[in-house]
Amino acid sequence: MKQQGVTIWLTGLSGAGKTTITHALEQKLREAGYALEVLDGDIVRTNLTKGLGFSKEDRDTNIRRIGFVANLLTRNGVIVLVSAISPYRDIRDEVRGTIGNFVEVFVNAPLNVCEERDVKGLYKKARAGEIKSFTGIDDPYEPPLNPEIECRTDLETLEESVTKIWQKLEELGYLAKPVAI
């Protein structure tokens, strides 16, 4: 059976758990034999979108470029895991429309929880005024209105979040369901 491509787009505040969920889901998908690629927002910024700042226009350009690569992979039968803050609803919706096979995962944790998890000290720097236009502090995050999946990482375990995503992908027909014998 030929694998169907899909982009699984994890969005949420810095520290919400996007990368953690992405790595766990990646491992489970690889173990099951699926072809996939991961596009992590931090890694993409240092390679594909180097030189872009954090204005709305630059952030939109960043997300469009990630979406462009995700679309190329998706239409060639690859499962693409995108882990990116992608704070603006309009650009996420634009990318969804371009890709088609698109599953939005809202990785949701309250701001105070994200700040507690902040090992890099980014929130502290943003609150001190050392980082400008930091999402959730002095730049908005627009939560998805109708994501296919919401993972409440302050209330559920990593395993519960991954299982929730896996089950939705099966339900939508992107993953083959095991055959009962």
Curated annotation (Swiss-Prot):
Keyword tags: ATP-binding, Kinase, Nucleotide-binding, Phosphoprotein, Transferase
CDD domains the UniProt entry points to: APSK (cd02027)
Active site: S86
Keyword Secreted: no
GO molecular-function terms, A-Z: adenylylsulfate kinase activity; ATP binding; sulfate adenylyltransferase (ATP) activity
Gene Ontology CC, one term: cytoplasm
EC numbers: 2.7.1.25
Binding site for ATP: G12, L13, S14, G15, A16, G17, K18, T19
Protein family: Belongs to the APS kinase family.
HAMAP family reported in the protein's UniProt record: Adenylyl_sulf_kinase
Designated name of the protein: Adenylyl-sulfate kinase
Native source species: Rippkaea orientalis (strain PCC 8801 / RF-1) (Cyanothece sp. (strain PCC 8801))
